[in-house]
């Protein structure tokens, strides 16, 4: 299964826990607004956070409240971004990005999830060298989407790579060019399965043992259930 299929499956799982997903998006939006201002046209981090929330069908009222909370004087709790790295079962490399107001709580929880599921939490840098930070835009096989036209628009806008998959198209950019490529595609009327700057694995790991598959699924589920966890990246090749 390609990356697009993985994203579609993940979105299906998230539909069942929509309230929790909205809470995570609201936190990310509020922090982005607090740090860079309430206007997404002048705050790239806020614009990306809003786009991600909308991709998960978060209502505009919820988004507006989160922006207002973050932009208000002395608004909200003090959150910080902390990234954890480690190995899951079968040697799968895992990166966990969190947004927390209590790093001791978050560190303890993340370590527990790894230990509980046949993995181990490592030190900073222990697996990140296996990933590249890239902008990734996924476009589905919608009506009227021409592969050739989409590729031309993406590459002319500054995309690094264009990959055709079974479920759609993957457009890769540098982190610096992500916003301009995304905005150009959106202006041309393309709709996205997802669009974000993320850590993309250089190689993937296939799990063949049933016990490893079960533990890896459980590890991802437990991490996704944690309110402090914003994003999870791994090099597990989901078949």
Curated annotation (Swiss-Prot):
A GO BP annotation: regulation of DNA-templated transcription
Does Amino-acid biosynthesis appear among the keywords? no
Q: Does the keyword Glycosyltransferase apply?
A: no
Query: What is the similarity comment for this entry?
Result: Belongs to the TACO1 family.
Its localization reads: Cytoplasm
Q: Which organism is it from?
A: Clostridioides difficile (strain 630) (Peptoclostridium difficile)
Q: Identify one Gene Ontology CC term for this UniProt entry.
A: cytosol
* InterPro entries, per the entry: Integrase-like_N (IPR017856), TACO1_YebC-like_2nd/3rd_dom (IPR048300), TACO1_YebC_N (IPR049083), Transcrip_reg_TACO1-like (IPR002876), Transcrip_reg_TACO1-like_dom3 (IPR026564), YebC-like (IPR029072)
Task: Recite the UniProt keywords alphabetically.
Answer: Cytoplasm, DNA-binding, Transcription, Transcription regulation
Q: Which GO terms describe its molecular function?
A: DNA binding
Name of the protein in its database record: Probable transcriptional regulatory protein CD630_07950
Reading the lineage from the top rank, the first entry is Bacteria
């Amino acid at each position: 299964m390609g990356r697009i299929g993985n994203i579609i499956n993940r979105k299906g799982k998230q539909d069942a826990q929509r309230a929790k997903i909205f809470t995570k998006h609201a936190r990310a939006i509020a922090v982005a607004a607090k740090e860079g201002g309430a206007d997404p046209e002048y705050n790239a981090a806020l614009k990306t956070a809003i786009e991600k929330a909308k991709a998960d069908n978060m209502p505009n009222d919820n988004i507006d409240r989160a922006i207002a909370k973050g932009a208000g004087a002395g608004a909200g709790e003090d959150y910080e971004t902390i990234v954890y790295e480690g190995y899951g079962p079968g040697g799968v490399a895992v990166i966990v990005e969190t947004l927390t107001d209590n790093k001791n709580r978050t560190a303890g929880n993340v370590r527990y999830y790894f230990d509980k599921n046949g993995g181990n939490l490592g030190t900073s840098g222990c697996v990140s060298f296996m990933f590249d930070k890239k902008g990734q835009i996924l476009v589905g096989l919608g009506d009227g989407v021409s592969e050739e036209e989409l590729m031309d628009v993406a590459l002319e806008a500054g995309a690094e790579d264009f990959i055709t998959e079974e479920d759609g198209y993957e457009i890769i950019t540098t982190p610096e060019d992500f916003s301009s490529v995304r905005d150009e595609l959106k202006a041309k009327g393309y709709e996205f399965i997802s669009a974000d700057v993320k850590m993309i694995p250089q190689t993937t790991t296939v799990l063949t043992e049933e016990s490893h598959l079960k533990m890896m699924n459980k590890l991802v589920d437990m991490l996704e259930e944690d309110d402090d966890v914003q994003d999870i990246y791994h090099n597990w090749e989901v078949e």
